[in-house]
């Protein structure tokens, strides 16, 4: 029976909560809400949905993640990492397909948390994370080319794949709108220089306000009407969304399951990475499993109100910390601020230029790319570089689902290869030095291995990757000793293939009248072997606690054999 480990940080934090804490959380929440606004709009539009869906996601998912999450300062909402996935799902399955996939991902995240797999997510190889994060950054940048250059495709559908997009772009680069280019460059410039004047005011917000006002004045008094705004493409609704559950059918669930896994894995990685970074800054420890359950609930509920996939956002979480956020209350305030903006200020969003949002996303993609880290990993071992490059190019050329699946498979194969290389099997046929043995008392004389006895020392996991290696070593020796002592003091675990290998070895040895003795089996391996029935075949009298005892048994066996021979 799995015991539910669900302990939201909000409830433990409120036990010693003060008015001062509330004041700082209130101010931090307001600032984070303002920071989240342009990003939520930009991520929503870039994902292929309306701007208010991005804000709704930040409200609903942001509230749930703060209310039920396992981190004190985590801020949840839509992120750039999901843009590529969402855009692809909508193109192939439509909005309803996105809703189903997101809700399925929510269920998967809840299960990951219930079965306490939060810590395992952290062990996904770093090259895979960097590879697909950098790949996503390139893809996000690619999706913004049309708005940066003001390209018009005359109703022609923009392909979902990387190569298809660039082919379409090149066919229309003869009709660049230079006003769009100027707006994008000015936006990027403002975002880049704002931190030099103020660390607390987000550059993206400053850029959107200044550029929107500038473009509005150009349209009103300069006669410049060729700069597209949000209002030119979307109908802005300043109202609460109605709850709606998508129609579910088995065929859709089967088709969308791989995509749901991708959303869940990516959401888990990004949220736990964000929470871990936050821990390092505030000196706290988040609860990974509680965080995953909260993320799952958020992703299950958000689509019902028209939201898209959400996760913990590192940039907004750091903004929360830097502005004094101390508890999940700040995240709840951030959601309330966005709700008020949605209800009362949303009509103003129609004046925001699309080229300005493209500039915001160019900065997002640059920050996400982590090109310095990527460059540094290229100096690592070839196996890591292989995983990095394959994951990166698969993300860019195909999609994130393929990249994560293939990247994880390659990482697993390389991991097994490394374990096989580190697991050593040595053969001792003469003597053992007690001064170098941790499971023996130190004696003056060396332990002599009797004639007709071979000692095999296994150092590392006894799993399917090493089982054949053991067989090859014995075959290479070619001789047939009277007794084989298999020393397993440094075997941390054994799998079913290892058990099968030992069983086969024991059966073959018995047919050849070769006696098998196990030495130094730890409690974990001992329990597995006993449960498998292997001890019934071998005989418990042939299980020795250390090599000294095993050699004593072997010496007696050899003496009895020689006596019987005479």
Residue ranges and their predicted role:
Residues 86, 166, 470-474, 550, ...:
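Generic hydrophobic alpha-helical segments
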Residues 75, 518, 543:
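Conserved SAM-binding loop
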């Amino acid at each position: 029976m799995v015991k539910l480990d669900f302990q939201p940080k909000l409830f433990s934090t409120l036990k010693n909560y003060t008015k001062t804490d509330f004041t700082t959380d209130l101010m931090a929440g307001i600032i984070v809400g303002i920071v989240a606004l342009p990003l939520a709009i930009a991520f929503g539009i870039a994902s292929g949905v309306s701007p208010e869906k991005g804000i709704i996601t930040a409200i609903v998912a942001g509230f749930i993640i703060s209310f039920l999450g396992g981190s004190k300062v985590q801020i949840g909402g839509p992120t750039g990492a999901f843009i590529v996935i969402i855009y692809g799902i909508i193109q192939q399955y439509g909005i309803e397909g996105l809703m189903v996939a997101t809700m399925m991902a929510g269920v998967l995240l809840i299960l990951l948390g219930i079965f306490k797999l939060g810590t395992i997510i952290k062990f996904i190889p770093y090259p895979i994370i960097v590879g697909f994060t950098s790949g996503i950054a390139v893809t996000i940048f690619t999706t913004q080319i049309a708005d940066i250059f003001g390209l018009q495709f005359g109703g022609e559908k923009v392909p979902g794949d990387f190569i298809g997009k660039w082919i379409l772009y090149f066919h229309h680069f003869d009709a660049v709108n230079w006003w769009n280019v100027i707006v994008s460059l000015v936006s990027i410039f403002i975002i880049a220089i704002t931190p030099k004047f103020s660390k607390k005011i987000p550059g993206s917000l400053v850029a959107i306000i200044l550029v929107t006002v500038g473009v509005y004045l150009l349209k009103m008094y300069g006669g410049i009407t060729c700069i597209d705004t949000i209002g030119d493409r979307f109908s802005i609704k300043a109202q609460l969304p109605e709850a709606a559950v998508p129609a579910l059918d088995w065929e859709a669930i089967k088709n969308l399951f791989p995509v749901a896994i991708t959303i869940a894995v990516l959401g888990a990685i990004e949220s736990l990475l964000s929470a871990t970074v936050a821990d390092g800054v505030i000196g706290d420890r988040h609860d990974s499993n509680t965080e995953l359950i909260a993320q799952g609930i958020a992703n299950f509920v958000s689509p019902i109100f028209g939201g898209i996939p959400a996760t913990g956002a590192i940039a907004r979480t750091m903004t929360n910390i830097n502005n004094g956020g101390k508890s999940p209350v700040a995240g709840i305030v951030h959601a309330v601020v966005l709700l008020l903006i949605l209800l009362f200020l949303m009509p103003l969003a129609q004046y925001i230029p699309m080229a300005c949002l493209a500039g915001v996303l160019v900065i997002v993609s640059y920050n996400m790319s982590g090109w310095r880290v990527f460059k540094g990993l290229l100096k690592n071992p070839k196996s890591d570089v292989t995983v990095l490059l394959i994951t990166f190019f698969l993300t860019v050329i195909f999609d994130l689902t393929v990249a994560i699946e293939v990247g994880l498979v390659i990482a697993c194969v390389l991991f097994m290869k490394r374990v096989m290389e580190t697991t050593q099997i040595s053969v001792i046929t003469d003597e053992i030095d007690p001064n170098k043995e941790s499971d023996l008392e130190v004696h003056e004389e060396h332990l002599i291995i009797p004639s007709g006895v071979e000692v095999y020392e296994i150092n590392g996991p006894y799993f399917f990757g090493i089982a054949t290696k053991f067989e090859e070593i014995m075959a290479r020796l070619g001789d047939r000793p009277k007794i084989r002592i298999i020393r397993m003091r440094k075997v941390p675990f054994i799998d079913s293939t290892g058990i099968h290998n030992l069983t086969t070895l024991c059966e073959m040895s018995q047919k050849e009248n070769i006696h098998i003795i196990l030495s130094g089996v730890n409690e974990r391996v001992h329990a597995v072997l006993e449960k498998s029935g292997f001890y019934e075949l071998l005989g418990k009298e042939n299980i020795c606690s250390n090599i000294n005892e095993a050699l004593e048994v072997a010496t007696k066996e050899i003496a009895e054999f020689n006596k019987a021979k005479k």
